Regions:
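Surface-exposed, charge/polar-rich loops and edge strands
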Residues: 2-181
Length: 181
């Protein structure tokens, strides 16, 4: 069995309210085991026989659309990947310490480097970005509501799916569900 973390996009926003027990039941129906949810923002930890990430994402997406009645884009990472995301320092430490918020966008696969200018166009005096593999780090030096950046704007402009989590959430996930040796 392999351990995974599923990050579900927009699970409890836009008028949708999903109980974590409903998510757990949907994952159990797929044959996954040791299912746990972590805060009510669409983070599900589970064990699966398959190690085929894309297949797992598709199965979860189909099951959740059937259960919930709407599309739920799913991003899977291993506990080792979550730990690496949490440890990574995308910006100078002083900038990170002073940031109003630091978020990480989980992407479906690696972003084509040719798209970087489109990401860089979102930079402002309060927003900056750093790409590392399949993750886009976003530092906001002021309140996020003052930022012109949003997940929806990112997806529209780049035609890529993403879901964002606070780096503190990733750190807590990594601490609670560490990689196994």
């Amino acid at each position: 069995m392999a351990r995974f973390v599923a990050f579900l996009r927009a699970i409890n926003v836009g008028g949708h309210v999903v109980k974590m027990d409903v998510l757990k039941a949907a994952f159990a129906e797929l044959g996954f085991t040791n299912i746990e949810t972590f805060i009510a923002s669409g983070n599900v930890i589970f064990d699966a026989r398959s190690k085929e990430r894309v297949n797992l994402e598709r199965r979860i997406e189909r099951a959740l659309e059937g259960t919930l009645g709407y599309e739920v884009t799913t991003f899977i990472r291993t506990p080792s990947e979550v730990a690496a995301i949490a440890r990574y320092e995308p910006f100078p430490r002083a900038a990170m310490a002073q940031a109003a918020s630091l978020n990480v966008g989980l992407l479906k696969g690696q972003m084509d480097p040719g798209l970087w200018p489109a990401v860089a166009a979102f930079r402002t005096e309060i927003d900056d970005f750093h790409l590392n593999g399949s993750e886009l780090y976003w530092i906001c030096r002021s309140r996020q509501m003052e930022s012109k950046f949003s997940n929806a704007a990112f997806e529209r402009k780049l035609k890529l799916s993403a879901t964002f989590r606070g780096l503190k959430t990733m750190e807590k996930l990594a601490a609670k569900f560490p990689p196994t040796a």
